[in-house]
């Protein structure tokens, strides 16, 4: 055997220094990721039980057992993640580790105690917002009062919820009845805005929010940037869209209660064809015709009304091993408007079901415009005559369909601008800000004495979230246009649609930045051109 050379010996011995410890093996990180996914799965199942008011999961597992398992995994996960040296990882592994550590700290705290307070009583809303200094505490207080109030509205002797009442405005032929029904929303407005004075809960909240965000990019701006819309373009684009609506619709002013009637003709004509008992079945059939088998995708629903249920429709993970999307909404009636919302929430569900990535990235970019945009991929079809004829056996003229589609979208854009302007100047009178926006762009007669802006829970529960709907409308118009150009029309059904869209838009979870996914699909940056083109299909005349 030939003796080793001196340099080789020196290298082998490391010049007398101890060898550096080896980096974590792929198996070590993979084991941590597997434990992470197990922990998230358990927390998802607990959260869904709490949202549904149940004590047992569909498979019979009790909440107590789920909490016990979750509590036993959390410290093990924390130890595993803390023991990984991120400096020894490759770029993607380091990013995955960072995602898991942030999620553990932010979203995987102790399981909340079960609610033993009951749901029969109204929250205490006789409080002075000026004595509440914590932003999150005030937000929770306002939202609790808003949630209860919007579900217990009296109109013409009947108790209804906010969405049912607003749907009725679009169907009532009697202007005076519409006015009465609209004003029946006043308790909702007061739950947010009080008497629009120094004691207004919202005005106190927006002052605290503005102080907290001073000198920083607003959440709405950051979310839009992540989707590919630069903040310096955002407000300008929204104004351009609102101006286009103003130009293609009649200039005569309408009362706010008549706005819903004007934009609701499609709902008036077609809602009778969607009774409550058909609502979920029709939703399933529409997606089945697009190649998305909701049963096979494990989509679950909680749609029945009950006291204490959140007033906001939402979709979430009900498990991640495998992914089980859960849709929560409340429907007392059927109708076109509720079908549109259910198709939207199911759009979220099929997004979740299509995620195919490593455990650390098995999530969605929640609360961003892209997420809201792709949820509307199919929901927007309900306003197209061809879709209506295919699924409802009747249709309305295109102009009525487009008014139905954009009536809600343009209100969302107005709310997004409203929130931006209130954050810039929290001392402004919110009633006046809203009155100017809606009269200048939507031809709605100004009523600064009415706080009718104060009926979106997102304004208090998730500041900046209305911008997701607004920016999302721009993004989905571009995505739908691009899909038709690359894949073909899907308005009457297309069994290959889901299989084509899922790997191009839905599968990534957190694997790729939203902007990269969107611009890759579009072949370039986002622009409002597709939405503006769609708006201009609308004639000015009103039947």
Residue ranges and their predicted role:
Residues 1-6:
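Bacterial N-terminal signal peptides that target proteins for export
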Residues 19, 24-31, 50-62, 79-83, ...:
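C-terminal, non-catalytic "cap/extension" segments appended to globular domains
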Residues 13-14:
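C-terminal motif of bacterial Sec signal peptides marking the signal peptidase cleavage site
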Residues 337-353, 372-376:
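Active-site recognition of the HExxH zinc-binding catalytic motif
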Residues 185-336:
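Contiguous, non-catalytic segments that form substrate-binding/exosite surfaces or channel walls
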Residues 360-374, 407, 461-469:
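Active-site metal-coordination segments of metallo-dependent hydrolases
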Residues 20-197, 464, 514, 528-529, ...:
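N-terminal helix-rich structural modules
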Residues 238-246, 365-401, 472:
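Post-HExxH zinc-binding segment in Zn-dependent metallohydrolases
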């Amino acid at each position: 055997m030939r003796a080793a050379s001196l340099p080789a010996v020196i290298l082998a011995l490391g010049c007398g220094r101890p060898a550096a410890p080896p980096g974590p093996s792929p198996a070590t990180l993979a084991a941590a990721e597997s434990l992470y996914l197990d922990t998230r799965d358990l927390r998802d199942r607990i959260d869904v039980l709490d949202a549904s008011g149940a004590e047992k999961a569909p498979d019979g597992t009790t909440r107590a057992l789920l909490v016990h398992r979750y509590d036993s995994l959390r410290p093990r996960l924390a130890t595993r993640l803390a023991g990984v040296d991120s400096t020894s990882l490759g770029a993607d592994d380091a990013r995955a580790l960072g995602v898991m550590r942030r999620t553990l700290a932010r979203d995987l705290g102790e399981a909340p105690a079960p609610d033993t307070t009951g749901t029969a009583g109204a929250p205490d809303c006789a409080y002075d917002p000026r004595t509440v200094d914590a932003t999150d505490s005030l937000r929770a207080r306002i939202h609790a009062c808003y949630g209860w109030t919007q579900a217990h509205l009296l109109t013409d002797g009947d108790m209804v919820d906010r969405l049912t009442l607003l749907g009725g405005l679009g169907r009532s032929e009697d202007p005076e009845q519409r006015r009465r029904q609209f004003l029946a929303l006043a308790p909702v407005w007061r739950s947010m805005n009080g008497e629009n004075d120094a004691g207004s809960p919202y005005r106190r909240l927006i002052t605290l929010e503005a102080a907290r965000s001073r000198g920083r990019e607003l959440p709405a701006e950051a979310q839009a940037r992540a989707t590919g819309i630069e903040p310096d373009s955002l407000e300008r684009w929204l104004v351009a869209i609102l101006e286009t609506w103003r130009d293609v619709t009649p200039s005569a002013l309408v009362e706010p209660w008549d706005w819903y009637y004007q934009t609701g003709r499609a709902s008036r004509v077609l809602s009778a064809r969607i009774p409550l008992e058909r609502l979920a079945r029709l939703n399933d059939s529409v997606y089945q015709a697009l190649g998305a088998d909701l049963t096979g995708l494990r989509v679950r629903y909680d749609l029945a009304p009950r006291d204490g249920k959140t007033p906001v429709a939402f979709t979430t993970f009900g498990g991640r091993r495998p992914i089980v999307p859960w849709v929560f909404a409340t429907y007392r009636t059927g109708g076109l408007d509720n079908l549109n919302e259910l198709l939207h929430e199911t759009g979220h569900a099929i997004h979740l079901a299509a995620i195919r990535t490593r455990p650390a990235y098995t999530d969605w970019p929640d609360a961003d415009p892209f997420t809201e945009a792709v949820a509307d991929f199919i929901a927007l079809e309900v306003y197209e005559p061809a879709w209506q004829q295919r699924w409802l056996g009747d249709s309305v003229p295109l102009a009525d369909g487009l008014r139905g589609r954009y009536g809600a979208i343009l209100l969302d854009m107005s709310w997004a601008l409203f929130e931006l302007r209130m954050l810039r100047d929290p001392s402004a009178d919110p009633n006046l800000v809203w009155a100017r926006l809606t009269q200048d762009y939507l031809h709605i007669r100004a009523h600064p004495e009415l706080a009718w802006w104060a009926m979106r829970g997102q304004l208090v529960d998730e500041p900046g979230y209305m911008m997701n709907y607004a920016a999302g409308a721009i993004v989905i118009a571009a995505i739908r246009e691009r899909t038709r150009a690359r894949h073909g029309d899907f308005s009457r059904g297309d069994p290959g649609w889901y299989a084509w869209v899922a790997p191009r838009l839905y599968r990534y979870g957190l694997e790729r930045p939203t902007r990269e996914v969107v611009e890759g699909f579009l072949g370039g940056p986002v622009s409002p051109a597709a939405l503006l083109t769609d708006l201009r299909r609308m004639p000015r005349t009103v039947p």
